[in-house]
Each structure stands twice: as structure tokens, then as C-alpha cells.
């Protein structure tokens, strides 16, 4: 059998292999009948063990680069790699090489005996674009075959050089990958060929349907060391998978769903990565390169390895688009800054935290220069887009949340452009949140918005007093936010010192009540009265309250106390007993009004008043009873003979023999939707209504220290009696029930102060059925 050496495409073989073959030629061209017995892996250099002679053997050491070229899986395999070439004789005739058919047969038989037991396959060594090497010249490992960079598919163990065909469809590729991944999961060491899925087609494949659930679990199985270069993943779903040490070079991941997909230690250079809008959670890149890869504007690049860009042109996208460089990555930009483009590319507050701003900013600080350069290109694009103030208004918050922070503030170009944006943003915040509570600040708000507001107050100190509602909220959240930095807290404390020194504020803090009692705030405890809000109408009026009180009044619960503050006029504490909270909040401190009204609408005591005192028949009394629920103390008293007689006329029909009439009882059940409720639930409601009427009869509202309206005392006692009939278990004891009843009627020498009875009953209800009490008792009495 004659094989011409010219059939081998030497230009495609690595340089060290060229040297090896050249050396063989040099030592045989002079007619020596040399027998090349082996070329083994040793630590010797290429030319160290060369013996020449008519019948001597020639042994070559394999350099490290050639070892790497064969890609053995481990060191043990590497040491067993062997190239055997037998009976090569140079005829000195135009480079022709004669290998006898007998020797070829012997070599193939020996090769098959050696490897079939281990693998049942043979891999011929191929070079990309070249014909096979001569028969009998093969590359293998003693335990398992290896494949060169040419990645030739396996061939059957026969004399034929015909190769097995590639998978012909995405389904076939998926089946092949499933087989390889499961073998790897089972602990089998895969060869490079087993892990070679270059030029694969996974279009429209949902990987969760072809892989076990363990690959989609958190900290689950990993697809490791696979080569997916130049492959197609268009419209596939690789969500929740973890690819480690994989190669995706030149692959297309267009409209791929990759929610929570993790790429680690991988090569994703020159990839077209445009993941689907149905991707819910962004993919992550950990120690992964993305050179010249096109990235969507909503990616998280926190773990990417960035390099200096080369001179490559921007990628070609069928839909068109502009691009900016982020290191060696390409970021997509809109062709025009339309309203939709502004929202989609810049408004991460409207798009689940995703925008080109957040994509650039997601890189670690070690890439600050690259981040600033990319942001400058973005600002140039926005400036060139000639956006109006109205066009930028919806994304002002998103813009300042990134560009008003280092390292971007170090850029003169960015600072000049963002300054008026920040001023408009601050003006809008003052207008919106001086009279209403700020939204509960999450991590994003604490770390990105609060520092911007502090900076804005620092630039415009007059706003501290003109908008003290907003200013105090900002300081409150800076001092209490768990995600605020120490730097933010320190700046907030320093700004508050400036605020306290203002002439409109300082008169209110030297009264022995503020902060640590000497005019300075005490930030070591939330119980200290550190906060001072100025009235929006009267410069002489202020409210002093603690951190805890301010927090709960801005975000109230049914148990919130609405009188746990000092009301100051000219620095002096004044009583709030006869001040309606709702009027105080409406006139002076509107920041609390919406929250107070929202809680007030959940209190349903007024429904019973409307049953007893209809506006058609008793309009004046109805207004007096309702007005009394808006303050802790009333100046209106109903103990004169005319008032007592009028009340008796109204309440006596409801209390035949001192008990609730059946008809009136049913009206109460209907008004409070208790017709089908359990006796205990009915009893709890009646008990709480009784506490309210006990308060009506006390000196705080319609009674005096020595007298109270009998009709109101009797009605309160009748409500309590009915509650006892329905469910004695809700009372502390029968003795306590009897004591309360005696106090209502002044029997057996009991102290008749209904204010004491009301307080005692209220404490019991708050302890054992607080939600019922909170749904009935007026806020001002809570």
C-alpha cells in the first residue's frame, strides 16, 4: 500500500507536530532503513533521544504543547499517550512511503485488541480541512481514546475510515446532550469529544424537559466543561441551569429564555446574546468573559471579566440599533430616544430593576473607568436626542439613582448634565412628599435615593424648614434604615444639626424636653424626642416626637397612639386634650392626615350613633356625638335638665326594663354584620361599644367630675349586660363584671366614675380582643 505524504495538509497541524514529522524525514532521507519504534511522552526535549544508524531505533520525546494538543482528560491518561509508527522505509523515491498490507493488518488488529475492551470505539486523528492520516498512524490513550482539535466524531472499530454522522435535528442534539450530561452526573469522566457540542442546534429546546430536575434546583447539578461554540440556542429555554467552564464562542442565544441561568468560568466571547423578554430573573455571569458579545440593556454583569476593547466593528443586528462599548462588551442602544425607548432603557424603577443604567453600574468598582466611559457615551446619546424636560421627567428618579453617585460624579460631562435633572427631581419630591408619607424605603431607596435627597438638602438648606415634613422623613429613614451606610447616617446627623440651629427651629429645643434634654439629639435610642416638625401654617407652632412615634404615625397600625407627642407654641408645651387630631393634622401637620383618615375609616363606632340619633330627627345631637369622637376631651356637657330629659326620651325606648330591646339588639347586629356571627364575637363587639358609651358618660366627654348623663350610663351598662348573657367567658371574672355593673349604677357604695370604668374595660379589650376594639373605638380615644 502506497501513501503519499503529500496527502497530509501539514499547514493545519500544530507547529510541534510539523517538527516531529520533519525530523523523521531528515533521519530517513539518506537511505537509512530505520525502524521508528515509538514516540513517547517523556520530560526530555524533542531532540534529546535521537539515535541514527542503519538498523537503530529512533525515539522522540513529546513536548508539552503536543501533549496539550491531544487533550487528555487527566495526568494518568497523558502519561499513557502513545504514537506508534512501524515499518516506515524511505525508498528515496520522491518522498513515497511504503507500508505493507500485512503490517497494516497487524497494526489494526493490535489496536483493536488494545482498545475494544475499554471503550468499544476508536477515534481516528483528523485535522480540520485535511484528509485522514495514513492507516496505522493513530493517536490514542491506553484507557480511552482522545480527539484532537479537529473534533472528529467516533468511527466504528474496523478498517474503514468512514465517520458517524452528526445529529440532524435539535431533538437529536438534545438527546445526545442528555446522554452526555447523565454520564457525567453518574461520575464518568467524559472525553473532550464527549463534551464537544460545537455547531450544535438546540433551537426551541426547553432544557427542563430533557434534563433531570436536579439540574434546575438551586445548588443542583452542573453542566461542566462542555463546548457549545458556534451553536444555536434561538428560542430555547435554559432557565435555572448552571454552566461551568463551558465555551459558547460565536454561539447565537437569540430570544433565549435564561431566567436565573448561571454562567461561571466560561468563555462567551463573540456571542449574540439577546435573551427573551419572558426572562423573569436575570442570568448571572461569574468569572466569565464576554469579549465583543452583544448584551441587552437589562443584563447583570456583576461577575464579568472585562478587558480593553479591540478594534472590532459593532455587531450587525437585523432590527438595527446603536451600540456603546463597556470595556470589550457591546451594549445595545435605541436608534431614537422615543417615549418607549426612554422607559425601556432608562426606567429601572418601572422595569423590575432593569435598565442600561443598572447594567453598566452592575460591574464591580475595579472597572470604574470603563463604567464612567460607557455612561459618558450614554449621556452624549441622551444629549444628542434633544429630550425635553417632560420627556425625562418619568425617569428622573432612575437617572439620579445612578448618575448622582460616584464614580460618575467625578465626570465633568456627566455632572453637568445630571445637575438640572437632580434639581427637578428634588423639587418634585418636595412638592409630593412634604404633606404625605414617603413610601416605605427598601434597600434600593435607602442606598440610591436617600443620599441624593441629602445632597439636595445640603445644596438647598432653605428647604429644610420650608419642607420640614419631607426633611424630617428623610432624616428619619437615614437614621433607621438598616441598609443605609454609616456615611449616609453621618451626613444625615450633620444636616440635622444645621436644621436645629435655624432661627425657626432653635426656640423649640431648649425646653428640657428635646433629645438628650440639653437641646441636642440623642441618636442612641429611638425613645428620645429627637424630631421636630414645623407647622405648615404657623411658624410659632411645632411638634416634637420620638423616632418610634414618628415611624408609627407615618405607617400606623390599629394600635397606633395619635397623641404621643409634644405640641409646642413658642417653645412651650401646650395641652392637646381639647384639640381634634384630625384638625391639627389638616391645618398644621398634613404629613399625618392621610394615614390618620385611613385608620379612622376603619373605626365603625359612628354606625351605632346613626342608628340611635338619626340625622333627620336628631341632627344637632348627632353632630355633637360625632364631633366628640374626634377629641380626647369635650367642652360640651349634657348634664343640664333639658339635655338629660332629651337623652332619656331617646334612649328609654331602647332600654325597656334596663335591657336592650330585641328590635334594637337586632339593629346593632345588622349594622355590624353580626347576625350570623358566634355569640362570642357578638359579645366582644357589644363589650367594645359599651366602653365607648362609658367614655361618653365620663367627665372627659359629656359628663363632669360630679355628674354624668344617666341615659348614657344606663345604655353602656345594658350593652355590657347583653355581652355577659352571650358570652361570660370574655370577661375577666364574674366579680369584675359585677364591679363594673355596680359602678355604672352607683350600687353597693361603688365608686361611680365612669372614666375609670371606661379605662378598665378598654384595657381588658385591648389585651384579649384588640382587633375588635380597634374596629370600633374612635382614634382620638384609643
UniProtKB/Swiss-Prot annotation:
Major site of localization recorded for this protein: secreted
GO biological process, one term: protein ubiquitination
Bridged cysteine pairs (disulfide): none
Matching Pfam families: SopA, SopA_C
EC numbers on record: 2.3.2.26
Coiled-coil annotated residue ranges, if any: none
Cellular localization per UniProt: Secreted; Host cell
Gene3D superfamilies for the chain: E3 ubiquitin-protein ligase SopA, effector protein (NleL), HECT-like ubiquitin ligase, Putative secreted effector protein
Post-translational modification: Ubiquitinated in the presence of host E1 ubiquitin-activating enzyme, E2 ubiquitin-conjugating enzyme and ubiquitin.
Active site: residue positions: 753
Catalytic reaction equation(s): S-ubiquitinyl-[E2 ubiquitin-conjugating enzyme]-L-cysteine + [acceptor protein]-L-lysine = [E2 ubiquitin-conjugating enzyme]-L-cysteine + N(6)-ubiquitinyl-[acceptor protein]-L-lysine
Single GO term (MF): ubiquitin-protein transferase activity
Function comment: Effector proteins function to alter host cell physiology and promote bacterial survival in host tissues. This protein is an E3 ubiquitin ligase that interferes with host's ubiquitination pathway.
Family per record: Belongs to the SopA E3 ligase family.
Record protein name field: E3 ubiquitin-protein ligase SopA
Provenance organism: Salmonella choleraesuis (strain SC-B67)
Gene that this polypeptide is encoded by: sopA
Amino acid at each position: 500500500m502506497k501513501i503519499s505524504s503529500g496527502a497530509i495538509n501539514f499547514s493545519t497541524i500544530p507547529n510541534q507536530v510539523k517538527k516531529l514529522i520533519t525530523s523523521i524525514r531528515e533521519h530517513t532521507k539518506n537511505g537509512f532503513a530505520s525502524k521508528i519504534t515509538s514516540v513517547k511522552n517523556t520530560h526530555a526535549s524533542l531532540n534529546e533521544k535521537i539515535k541514527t544508524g542503519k538498523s537503530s531505533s529512533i525515539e522522540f520525546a513529546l513536548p508539552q504543547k503536543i501533549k496539550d494538543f491531544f487533550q487528555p482528560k487527566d495526568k494518568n491518561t497523558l502519561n499513557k499517550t502513545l504514537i506508534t509508527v512501524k515499518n516506515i522505509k524511505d525508498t528515496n523515491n520522491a518522498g513515497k512511503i511504503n507500508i505493507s498490507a500485512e503490517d497494516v493488518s497487524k497494526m489494526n488488529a493490535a489496536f483493536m485488541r488494545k482498545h475494544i475492551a475499554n471503550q468499544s470505539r476508536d477515534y481516528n486523528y483528523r485535522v480540520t480541512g485535511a484528509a485522514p492520516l495514513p492507516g496505522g498512524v493513530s493517536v490514542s490513550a491506553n484507557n480511552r481514546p482522545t480527539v484532537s482539535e479537529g473534533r472528529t466524531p467516533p468511527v466504528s472499530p474496523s478498517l474503514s475510515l468512514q465517520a458517524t454522522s452528526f445529529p440532524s435535528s435539535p431533538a437529536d442534539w438534545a438527546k445526545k446532550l442528555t446522554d452526555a450530561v447523565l454520564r457525567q452526573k453518574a461520575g464518568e469522566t467524559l472525553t473532550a469529544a464527549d463534551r464537544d457540542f460545537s455547531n450544535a442546534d438546540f433551537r426551541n429546546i426547553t432544557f427542563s424537559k430533557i434534563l433531570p430536575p436536579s439540574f434546575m434546583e438551586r445548588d443542583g447539578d452542573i453542566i461542566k466543561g462542555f463546548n457549545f461554540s458556534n451553536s444555536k440556542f434561538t428560542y430555547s429555554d435554559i432557565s435555572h441551569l448552571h454552566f461551568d467552564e463551558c465555551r459558547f464562542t460565536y454561539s447565537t442565544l437569540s430570544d433565549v429564555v435564561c431566567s436565573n441561568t448561571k454562567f461561571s468560568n466560561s468563555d462567551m466571547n463573540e456571542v449574540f446574546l439577546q435573551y427573551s423578554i419572558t426572562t423573569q430573573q436575570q442570568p448571572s455571569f461569574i468569572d466569565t468573559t464576554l469579549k465583543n458579545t452583544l448584551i441587552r440593556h437589562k443584563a447583570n454583569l456583576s461577575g464579568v471579566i472585562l478587558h480593553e476593547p479591540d478594534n472590532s466593528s459593532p455587531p450587525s443586528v437585523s432590527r438595527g440599533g446603536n451600540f456603546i462599548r463597556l470595556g470589550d462588551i457591546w451594549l445595545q442602544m435605541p436608534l431614537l430616544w422615543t417615549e418607549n425607548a426612554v422607559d425601556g432603557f432608562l426606567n429601572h424603577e418601572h422595569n423590575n430593576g432593569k435598565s442600561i443604567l443598572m447594567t453598566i453600574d452592575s460591574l464591580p468598582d475595579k472597572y470604574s473607568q470603563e463604567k464612567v466611559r460607557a455612561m459618558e457615551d450614554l449621556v452624549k446619546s441622551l444629549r444628542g436626542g434633544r429630550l425635553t424636560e417632560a420627556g425625562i421627567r418619568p425617569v428622573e428618579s432612575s437617572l439620579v439613582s445612578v448618575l448622582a453617585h460616584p464614580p460618575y460624579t467625578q465626570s465633568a460631562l456627566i455632572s453637568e448634565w445630571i445637575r438640572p435633572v437632580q434639581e427637578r427631581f428634588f423639587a418634585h419630591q418636595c412638592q409630593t412628599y412634604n404633606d404625605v408619607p414617603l413610601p416605605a424605603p427598601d434597600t434600593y431607596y435607602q442606598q440610591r435615593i436617600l443620599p441624593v435627597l441629602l445632597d439636595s438638602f445640603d445644596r438647598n438648606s432653605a428647604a429644610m424648614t420650608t419642607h420640614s415634613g419631607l426633611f424630617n422623613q428623610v432624616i428619619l429613614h437615614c437614621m433607621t434604615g438598616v441598609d443605609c451606610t454609616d456615611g449616609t447616617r453621618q451626613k444625615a446627623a450633620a444636616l440635622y444639626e444645621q436644621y436645629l440651629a435655624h432661627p425657626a427651629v432653635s426656640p423649640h429645643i431648649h425646653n428640657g424636653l428635646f433629645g438628650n434634654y440639653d437641646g441636642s439629639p440623642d441618636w442612641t435610642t429611638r425613645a428620645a424626642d429627637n424630631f421636630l416638625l414645623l407647622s405648615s401654617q404657623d411658624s410659632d407652632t411645632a411638634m416634637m416626637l420620638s423616632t418610634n412615634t414618628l415611624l408609627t404615625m407615618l405607617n400606623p397600625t390599629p394600635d397606633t397612639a395619635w397623641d404621643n407627642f409634644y405640641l409646642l407654641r413658642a417653645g412651650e408645651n401646650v395641652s392637646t386634650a381639647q384639640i381634634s387630631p384630625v384638625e391639627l393634622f389638616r391645618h398644621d401637620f398634613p404629613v399625618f392626615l392621610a394615614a390618620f383618615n385611613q385608620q379612622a375609616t376603619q373605626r365603625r363606632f359612628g354606625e351605632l350613633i346613626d342608628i340611635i340619633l338619626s340625622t333627620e330627627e336628631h341632627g344637632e345631637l348627632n353632630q355633637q356625638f360625632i364631633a366628640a369622637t374626634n377629641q380626647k376631651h369635650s367642652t360640651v356637657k349634657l348634664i343640664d335638665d333639658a339635655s338629660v330629659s332629651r337623652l332619656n326620651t331617646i334612649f328609654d325606648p331602647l332600654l325597656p326594663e334596663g335591657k336592650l330591646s330585641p328590635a334594637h339588639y337586632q339593629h346593632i347586629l345588622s349594622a355590624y354584620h353580626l347576625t350570623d356571627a358566634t355569640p362570642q364575637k357578638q359579645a366582644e363587639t357589644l363589650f367594645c361599644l359599651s366602653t365607648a358609651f362609658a367614655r361618653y358618660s365620663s367627665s372627659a366627654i359629656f359628663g363632669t367630675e360630679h355628674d354624668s348623663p344617666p341615659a348614657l350610663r344606663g345604655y353602656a351598662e345594658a350593652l355590657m349586660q347583653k355581652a355577659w348573657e352571650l358570652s361570660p367567658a370574655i370577661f375577666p371574672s364574674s366579680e369584675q363584671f359585677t364591679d363594673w355593673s355596680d359602678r355604672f349604677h352607683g350600687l353597693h357604695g361603688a365608686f361611680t366614675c365612669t372614666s375609670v370604668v371606661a379605662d378598665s374595660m378598654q384595657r381588658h379589650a385591648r389585651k384579649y380582643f384588640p382587633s375588635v376594639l380597634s374596629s370600633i373605638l374612635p382614634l382620638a380615644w384609643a
